[in-house]
């Protein structure tokens, strides 16, 4: 530091030093900060060195050393300043109380530390107060989650967005068709059918037979899918679209909603079949209700095949009005004529999708899988923005939180001797029976290939068995949050609340994997990080009443197929299976914290249970 340094330009009197400190300036994110005014003047009074200062209150500065491991570190040597400090003669008698160091506010950190760093050994030149690192706030995950929900309305978009996020963070895509070359410290992911994904990170100290910490859930959601040939005859001037409900879709909550269309389109390009994602995110379809004036007919029950058919346009050509559709002309324009896929689809829909994807030759469209979705974006709500209102929360919520937790845990991978894994399955809402579902071989095959890659020659079978035995699975599916209008539907003391943390789901009839041991393991993992963040997630408990039926999760089928210990734990939400549901605005972040604590702490916690 030179004499012209801004910190030395203004001399400070003793009266200034012992007066109330002025409001400090915010620290800059750099390798050095401007020292407090009371400690950086050209004429320094004698100050007794507070050798008994408590840890965290002040650190001494090593002359000529810069603390590069801390974003808020103090600058290096100031020989002139230090010499002035040491040479200043002490007064005969202390007349005033010792100066009060200026209060330095917390500075938000980009990547908060998990544990407080111990004071470093330094010279005795002076003491400088060091600010505490800002703690991670669950609210920081609210907007990223709502953006993800709005931008990825179909399962194809959701999985694709996860894959892109993984690649941005150093994960390498593997193909099940190819041979793998895995290494300790590596990060990888595998897709199946474009609707299921497994990502895993190998600890730097991983050895064959070691366990895996796994968070598994499903990324599919209730929707209405277009039928293979969705073209319908015009009724009373309305153009309608043939759709079929996926799981419990087309319920009463689907009436009068603004519905867009999206999914994946297979296109022939340069002799190859490529997949393109499409999203028509403006209101296209509507399922209109019958006005209550018509009496009993408006009250239902309703036939999903004949009375819940979306309208997508008008065609009054039967009354002499001009029509934008000429079926024969359209078929003739498609190369291949009636045999081409596009000729079997609503022509205005074909044109809209082709325009969105830049397709000029309709005959290059080989096939597609499209579905309806609510176009209303995910939003925060409530007087203090305590809620998130969105579609498809079940279960994009736990899936997204699990992936973020895996990405966050990369910073501690170098000290791990285990596998950290997130598995997102399709078809959970309809029984998980397909190859991309949890009843398929997707998860076992990935773990088997990892075991084979690291196992010594001839020891593959033993390594796989030990891997399963040393692993633990958190089956993460959303949980019913308590509804204040229907309290009698919930079991007392087993009713999770929003913005408190995930809930452990129990069921005495084996619909869930939770037991006393698995609950204790997860609780210990969460307890390890108490106080690290701005808000600690609280593990809540859910169980249905004896007079209610339970849903299911991927947990029991995965645990039974592999022998892996497991627990069911998910994030609470209201209005499950509605087209528009609710969760807490802090719940995505609290879910991330819970899953991250499990991924990072299971290895050490498991030692307590051996």
Language model segments and positions:
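N-terminal hydrophobic/helix-forming segments and targeting peptides
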Residues: 2-4, 10-11, 16, 20-93, ...
């Amino acid at each position: 530091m030179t004499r012209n340094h801004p910190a030395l330009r203004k001399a400070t009197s003793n009266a200034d030093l012992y007066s109330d400190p002025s409001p400090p300036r915010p620290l800059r994110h750099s390798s050095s900060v401007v020292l407090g005014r009371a400690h950086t003047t050209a004429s320094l009074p004698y100050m007794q060195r507070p050798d008994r200062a408590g840890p965290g209150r002040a650190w001494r500065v090593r002359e000529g050393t810069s603390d590069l491991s801390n974003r808020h570190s103090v600058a290096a040597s100031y020989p002139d300043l230090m010499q002035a400090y040491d040479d200043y003669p002490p007064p005969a008698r202390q007349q005033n109380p010792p100066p009060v160091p200026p209060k330095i506010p917390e500075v938000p950190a980009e990547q908060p530390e998990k544990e407080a760093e111990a004071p470093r050994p330094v010279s005795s030149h002076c003491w400088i107060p060091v600010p505490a690192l800002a703690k991670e706030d669950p609210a920081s995950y609210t907007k990223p989650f709502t953006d993800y929900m709005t931008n990825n309305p179909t399962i194809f978009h959701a999985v694709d967005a996860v894959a892109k996020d993984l690649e941005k963070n150093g994960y390498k895509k593997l193909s099940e068709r190819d041979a793998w070359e895995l290494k300790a410290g590596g990060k990888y992911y595998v897709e199946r059918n474009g609707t299921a994904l497994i990502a895993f990170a190998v600890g730097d100290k991983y050895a064959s037979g070691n366990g895996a910490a796994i968070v598994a859930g499903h990324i599919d959601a209730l929707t209405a899918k277009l039928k293979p040939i969705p073209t319908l005859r015009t009724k009373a001037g309305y153009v309608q679209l043939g759709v079929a409900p996926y799981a419990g879709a087309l319920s009463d909550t689907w009436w009068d909603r603004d519905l867009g269309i999206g999914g994946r389109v297979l296109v022939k390009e340069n002799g190859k079949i490529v997949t393109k994602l499409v999203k028509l995110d403006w209101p296209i379809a509507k399922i209109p209700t019958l006005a209550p004036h018509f009496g009993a007919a408006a009250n239902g029950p309703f036939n999903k095949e004949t009375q819940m058919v979306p309208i997508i346009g008008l065609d009054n050509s039967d009354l002499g009005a001009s029509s934008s559709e000429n079926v024969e002309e359209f078929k003739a324009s498609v190369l291949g004529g009636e045999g081409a896929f596009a000729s079997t689809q609503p022509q205005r829909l074909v044109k809209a999708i082709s325009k969105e994807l830049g397709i000029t030759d309709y005959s290059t469209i080989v096939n597609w899988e499209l579905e309806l979705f609510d176009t209303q974006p995910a939003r925060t709500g409530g007087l203090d923005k305590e809620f998130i209102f969105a579609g498809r929360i079940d279960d994009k919520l736990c899936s997204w939180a699990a992936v973020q937790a895996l990405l966050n845990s990369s910073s501690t991978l170098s000290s791990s001797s285990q596998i950290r894994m997130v598995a997102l399955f399709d078809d959970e809402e309809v029984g998980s029976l397909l190859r991309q579902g949890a009843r398929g071989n997707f998860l076992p095959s990935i773990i088997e290939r990892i075991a084979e890659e690291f196992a010594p020659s001839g020891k593959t079978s033993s390594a796989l068995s030990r891997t399963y035995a040393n692993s633990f699975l958190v089956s993460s599916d959303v949980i019913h949050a308590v509804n204040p209008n229907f309290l009698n539907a919930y079991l007392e003391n087993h009713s999770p609340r929003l913005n408190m943390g995930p809930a452990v789901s129990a069921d005495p009839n084996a619909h869930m994997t939770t037991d006393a041991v698995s609950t204790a393991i997860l609780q210990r993992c969460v307890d390890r990080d108490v106080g690290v963040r701005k808000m600690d997630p609280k593990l809540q408990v859910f169980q249905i009443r004896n007079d209610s039926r339970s849903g299911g999760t991927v947990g029991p089928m995965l645990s039974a197929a592999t022998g892996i210990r497991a627990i069911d734990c998910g994030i609470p939400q209201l209005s499950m299976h509605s087209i528009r549901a609710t969760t807490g605005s802090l719940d995505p972040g609290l879910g991330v914290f819970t899953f991250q604590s499990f991924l990072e702490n299971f290895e050490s916690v498991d030692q307590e249970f051996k």
